[in-house]
Amino acid sequence: AYPAAFPDEVIEVMAAEPKICKYLDIPFQHISDAQLAAMHRRHTKAEAMELIRRLRTAIPDLALRTTLLVGYPGETEADFEELLEFVREVRFERLGVFAYSEEEGTYSAEQLRDDVPEAVKQERVERIMALQNEISLENNRRRVGRTERVIIDSRQGDFYVGRTQYDSPEVDQEILIPVGERRLLRGHFYEAEVTSAADYDLYGEVRTK
């Protein structure tokens, strides 16, 4: 889903329908108005923040994922600090960040100068991910003691590997459940209590009926 003109109908349906996962992937890319304009994004910082407010209000248990881009041509230190504060304020449940690189045939590659040094780009990626690691760990620790509906994807060694409704396969975190007497089946759902948390993984135990 993209931020510009995000439909209210989607928010209403997600809030009301229990069969829909409370998970959205919205690629904000940046939050500085100067960078958004340079990227030809069709929304402003104010519009992005208002969309997030509407989503959080309507769907309190929403897991919000985003992707960010640092080092785009013209990104200043002030632009980056604004982006860092955005991550700190919004506290995304899931987040990825990439360093800009020229892609042949694109507007930015043909019309803009790649003026942010590679070392600076990588430092900015690392700073955002260090902050996100802290946020993710804090978010996960708050889930300890909760019971989550989990789908089992696989067994790896001494653990069953599953996901909650807040996790997309292969890109998000997993919940690891120790192998015990009860056999868990791939593709089946179970109620699992979260027993401990790491920055990008949960650990749990399946509740017995």
Question: Language-model features: where?
Answer:
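Proteins enriched for Cys/Gly/acidic motifs involved in redox and nucleic-acid/cofactor modification
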Residues: 24, 46-57, 81, 85-89, ...
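Terminal RNA-binding accessory module
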Residues: 110-209
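Conserved, mostly hydrophobic/aromatic
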Residues: 26, 67, 87, 95, ...
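Conserved SAM/AdoMet-binding glycine-rich loop
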Residues: 1-80, 88
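Generic beta-strand/beta-sheet core signal
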Residues: 1, 27-29, 65-69, 98-100, ...
